């Protein structure tokens, strides 16, 4: 079974579109003999079930949202134990976004949910999709609304710093790689390379 794949990074970096294409690509002879299971972005379900919105940033509700999202992500991964999956986001995403509210990231880093998710990420292939392609920037009730790209692109550094701090090996899918075939080729090449480690 190939390594599980975690597609992480700031919003509007092409993660969900990439995952949809990966789902169609597999099985792929010589790489993966079985279809891949998909963990869809859990935060949308958590927000819908609990009445959260992106307007809750900076409030206690924002902090609660990040904790519930981390827990839901961990449960989604555990539900596919023994199955090959690709995950739209990961346990690290709510930790990054917790920094935008009152809650410190340390509180989430100390949870059992993060420790379990981190181990799966350390054993998997982590693709960090880089933000910065302005044509992809959008907002809705879930996504934060950025007035310019500077703050949005700064999230790249937060993801990289935390991945390194948590000893999670990752590769960056650069923002200028916009062709879907090139994005898919990048992921497949990294998956093959990681299987040889």
Question: Where are the model-predicted features located?
Answer:
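A glycine- and Lys/Arg-enriched "phosphate-lid" helix/loop adjacent to the NTP-binding pocket
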Residues: 102-179
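The conserved Walker
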Residues: 11
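C-terminal accessory "lid"/substrate-recognition subdomains
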Residues: 164, 168-172, 181-197
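Conserved nucleotide-sensing/catalytic segment adjacent to the nucleotide-binding pocket
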Residues: 51-100, 105
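Conserved lysine of the Walker
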Residues: 15
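Hydrophobic anchor at the beta1->P-loop junction of P-loop NTPases
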Residues: 7
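Post-Walker A alpha-helix
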Residues: 18-19
